[in-house]
Design a protein with these regions (language model features):
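N-terminal metal-binding scaffold of metallo-dependent hydrolase/deaminase domains
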Residues: 1-38, 48-50, 370
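Divalent metal-coordination and catalytic microenvironments
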Residues: 10, 25, 47, 58, ...
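Active-site gating loops and adjacent loop-to-helix segments of metal-dependent hydrolytic enzymes
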Residues: 65-99, 206, 224-242, 260-263, ...
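Alpha-helical scaffold segments that flank or form the walls of functional sites
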Residues: 67-121, 127-142, 168-174
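Active-site core of metal-dependent hydrolases
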Residues: 153-163, 174-282, 293, 302
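His/Asp/Glu-enriched, well-ordered alpha-helical/loop segment
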Residues: 230-241, 285-367
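C-terminal cap of metal-dependent C-N hydrolases
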Residues: 356-398
Length: 398
């Protein structure tokens, strides 16, 4: 059993200074003045901000190029989803990347940046089989004490158009995948009903959740949202389905959007948005006001799709705030809530937070306010996972 920890003089969400006692992985006391047990290790917060652990609810840790020579993007025109996928699959074969090595490198960088939870999609196709999945599962096993990870079995190259993929997805679920993924059921597989019926059937058989990539635009994407909601309701999977990206929600007229909002609320479907690209994306404030669960993430980091994303969730919040046109502190903090509490909810973590009894997943970071931390992106002073120090001054310790 680890010694207790006293985290002294920190400001939860920028509020009044206080101290926390961490014991057996939990927050056991919060008070301005705490007398630590004789065996406690004391960490001085120096009135810095205290945030709950950052939650990356949409990652692709299997495909980064971190630690390798710079990759100049080579995706050919017209740069559709299919073009990115084909280019990526070719380069992964040529570069002979170790998914375990690359995913472990990304996770350690994320831990240094205050990330305590990751939901990662992992490519499963008939070229690589389960190799990428197995590499990520190895990383999860090695770092499970330092980070909570969920794995989504993801048919990035298509499913129905590549015979054998469905069996591989189901095999991944049997081997421990937490979620089954999907991808653009009309534009990729060209059969939206069969695509969705297939992945929902796998989820229903094995009791896993669904997290579906939906890039399809306008009314085509909106139609897919309707089909997803229908199947969620029919199988009683309310609260167990996430739709990621969902650009269509920012492209349809108000009347249609209102109908979709009703379906999303009724079926407790989570929307994951990270504001990627330069086109429309979901109206996050409006969805939040309708009580639709929201989360965000990094997407792929430094990969064959593009060079820009980083492992830092505060950087993602900053970018998302820019894309939303947010300038007020309360607006930025709303996005930070999505990157913390929102992500923890979608990952089903009921022990998350900054209250007594919560697991001690904590980030100490300089800044007068949470918004300043988002804008300045300073190194994280301390990162704790279940009451264990896992990063200090921007350096991962595991």
């Amino acid at each position: 059993m680890a010694d207790p920890i006293l985290l002294r003089n920190v400001r939860p969400w920028g509020k009044a200074p206080t101290s926390l006692l961490l014991e057996d992985g939990l927050i056991t006391q919060i008070a301005a003045q705490l007398v630590p047990p004789p065996t406690a290790t004391i960490y001085e917060g120096q009135q810095q901000l205290l945030l709950p652990g950052l939650v990356n609810a949409h990652a692709h840790i299997d495909k980064n190029l971190l630690g390798r020579p710079w990759h100049a993007n080579q995706t050919p025109e017209p740069r559709r989803i299919r073009d990115y996928v084909d280019n990526e699959r070719r380069l992964r074969r040529e570069l002979e990347l170790s998914t375990h090595t690359q995913s472990a490198l990304e996770v350690r960088q994320a831990i240094a940046a205050g990330v305590t939870h990751i939901r990662t999609h992992v490519d499963i196709d008939t070229d690589a089989g389960l190799a990428h999945f197995e590499g990520v599962m190895q990383t999860r096993a090695e770092l499970n004490a330092a980070l909570t990870m969920q794995v989504v079995a993801f048919p990035q190259s298509g499913m129905l158009i590549r015979p054998g993929t469905v069996a591989l997805l189901e095999a991944a679920v049997k081997l421990g995948a937490d979620c089954i993924g999907g991808l653009d059921p009309s534009t990729v597989d060209r059969d939206p009903a069969k695509h969705l019926d297939t992945i929902f059937a796998i989820a229903d058989r094995h009791g896993v959740e669904l997290d579906i990539h939906l890039h399809e635009p306008g009314t085509l994407g909106a139609f897919a949202v309707e089909l997803i909601a229908e199947r969620t309701r029919a199988l009683g999977l309310q609260g167990r389905v996430t739709i990621s990206h969902v650009f269509c929600l920012g492209m349809i007229d108000d009347a249609y959007l209102n109908r979709l909002i009703e379906l999303l609320v009724e079926n407790r479907i989570t929307i994951m948005s990270l504001g990627s690209g330069n086109g429309p994306f979901p109206p996050l404030k409006r969805l939040h006001e309708a009580d639709i669960p929201l989360c965000t993430g990094t997407d792929g980091v430094r990969d064959t799709w593009g060079p820009y994303n980083s492992v830092d969730l505060l950087d993602r919040v900053k970018f998302l705030g820019y894309r939303c046109g947010f300038r007020k502190d309360e607006e930025v903090e709303f996005l930070l809530e999505i990157a913390t509490t929102g992500g923890a909810k979608v990952m089903g973590d009921n022990d998350y937070g900054l209250a007594v009894g919560c697991r001690a997943d904590l980030v100490v970071v300089p800044g007068d306010t949470p918004t300043q931390a988002v804008v300045d992106l300073p190194p994280r002073t301390f990162v704790f996972k279940a009451g264990r120090l896992v990063a200090e001054n921007g350096v991962c310790l595991v």
